[in-house]
A protein has these predicted regions:
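N-terminal binding-site loop/beta-alpha segment at the start of enzyme catalytic domains
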Residues: 2-106
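Beta/alpha (TIM)-barrel catalytic core signal, keyed to glycine-rich beta->alpha loops juxtaposed to Asp/Glu
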Residues: 14-31, 155-305
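Acidic (Asp/Glu)-rich catalytic clusters
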Residues: 35, 96-107, 140-143, 194-196, ...
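A short acidic, helix-capping loop that chelates divalent metal ions and anchors anionic groups
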Residues: 51-55, 115-122, 238-239, 281-284
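Alpha-helix N-cap and loop-to-helix initiation/capping positions
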Residues: 57-64, 90, 94, 122-133, ...
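Short, acidic/polar
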Residues: 58-72, 126-142, 186-192
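A short, structured active-site edge motif that brings together acidic residues
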Residues: 105-118, 184
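Active-site groove signature of glycoside hydrolases
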Residues: 139-158
Length: 305
């Protein structure tokens, strides 16, 4: 059974209770401000799953993908994360189809820096000319004049890092990009980039049992940057005898909801972006914004690593 399919009857009951209490449950996560001028709810949405298998091609059900995006906004989501490479291009096109003209306050973040040779295949490309083509394509597909948050998907080891950072700074000066973020970077790389271009966010893999980027979370806290965790649940966390499952049973929630609630509790700079291609799973994910873990719950999860 996959992560999204693991929601139990009790988790659906928890979700329904949250929706009776708060018709825009994403707001319960609180807010974070990016770059001093973009305030968003800390429960966002990640668009990677709005594509085909291997993050390639169109989704099996495009109409459902559109419903997911519209429902996310109805539930209070005002931060959507995507990338040129999701599809490629597919997720950005669906976002525009579903939501343009965009509601006031909706922030769309996208990323560049990958080529897609085929399904499930990724190759870094941080050449400035390639990044420019990707950015121009994203602007066109999203029907925007400026990207609110443009993230370097990976630092390309084949291209001097400062050339990549310089390109991002140039896009910002041209008015094509409002703010800049990084993905899968060390603390030292964040600091190096900040010497070239203002950085407002970091998107790294992070979850209850994979906390290798704790030092980056702490850096983000010190410097007022958003930390956007991807892959919020590892396969091992689904163990029915594990702490996440025990807490989920006590809380009448799903393991996935507990994992998301832990991330939100981990740090005030966390901006979570759970993704799905199903409206039902979307509602379960967003309901996690209402889930408050106790001190005992958090202590139990602190012992996972």
């Amino acid at each position: 059974m996959g992560i999204e399919e693991g929601a139990t009857k009790v988790s659906r009951q928890f979700t329904a209770t949250c929706f009776r209490m708060e018709q825009r449950p994403a707001t319960a996560a609180g807010t974070i401000t990016l770059g001093g001028d973009l305030t968003v709810n800390r429960m966002g949405f990640g668009a990677m799953r709005l594509t085909g298998e291997g993050i390639w091609g169109p989704p099996d059900d495009r109409a459902e993908a559109i419903r997911v995006l519209r429902r996310a906004v109805e539930l209070g989501v005002n931060f959507i994360d995507t990338a040129d490479s999701y599809g490629p291009h597919v997720a950005e096109e669906i976002i525009a189809e579903a939501l343009h003209p965009y509601p006031d306050g909706l922030v769309i973040a996208t990323k560049g820096g990958f080529e897609r040779p085929g399904p499930g295949k990724w190759a870094t490309n941080g050449r400035p000319d390639y990044l420019r083509r990707q950015l121009e394509g994203s602007l066109r597909r999203l029907r925007l004049d400026r990207i609110d948050l443009y993230q370097l998907h990976r630092i390309d080891p084949k291209v001097p890092a400062n050339e990549q950072f310089d390109a991002l700074r140039g896009f910002q000066r041209e008015g094509l990009v409002r703010h800049v973020g990084l993905s899968e970077v060390t603390g030292a790389e964040v600091e190096r980039a900040r010497g070239v271009v203002p950085i407002v966010s970091v998107q790294n893999r992070y979850n209850v049992s994979d906390r290798q980027w704790d030092e980056v979370v702490e850096l983000c806290e010190r410097e007022g940057l958003a930390f956007i965790p991807w892959f919020p649940l590892s396969a091992g966390d689904l163990d029915e005898a594990g702490p996440l499952a025990r807490i989920a049973r006590r809380r009448r929630a799903s393991v996935y909801q507990v994992a998301l609630a832990w991330l939100l509790a981990r740090s005030p700079v966390m901006l979570v972006i759970p993704g799905t291609s199903s409206v039902a799973h979307l509602e379960q994910n967003i309901a996690a914004a209402e889930l408050r873990l106790s001190a005992d719950d958090l202590a139990e999860l602190a012992a996972v690593v």
